[in-house]
Amino acid sequence: MVDTQKIRNGIASLPKDIQDQILILLEKEESGNETKNMKLLGGITIPANTQTFDPKIIFAAGEHDGTKFYHGDNFKKYIFKPAKLVGGVEVQNFKSYESKINLYDKQIREEIGQQVIKPDQLWTAWKDLIFKQPQGQSGSLKNNGYSNVWYVQCADGIVRAVRCFWDADDSEWYLSCYELEDDFWNDDHQFFVGDDLVTSVPA
């Protein structure tokens, strides 16, 4: 929340009407960063992928190249096993939101948007983001045990929630996949939604 008194103290030398205008603008900006149950954390840009790579190699379970991965069963079935070589993928712009309370997928998507991405877009985003935090370092992805979630249209055409989170106990990135509405998400998880370059599929 905007601490109006602290801000007013800092701009006390300005005329009263100017102080009021500044506070109004700050409050409007803050309100625009939140929905009812989701807080906007910021935006990230994933560079275009121009070199073909094999996600089955760089995201294979186990430790390799200084990064360790663990795969959940649904992730293996719906994301990893059907994975194909990733070629050209356009620049992706995402906004990230943090859940403020326990929410189901339908509630989350009603607030942040219905956009979903395809697997090659997910692999490209993860290739950029996870390998900037290979040992759970600070960065765009949460590294405190909370999830980083994307809504992905899997190879079978079904939209599912796909997440990665840093498991500090085992020093590994845990990759998993869930059916929508399978359970609620606790507060403080991070959800990514894309811009108009991302495919839109009904909830």
What label would you give each PLM region?
Residues 1-115, 122-203:
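A binding-site-centric feature that preferentially detects glycan-recognition modules on secreted/surface proteins
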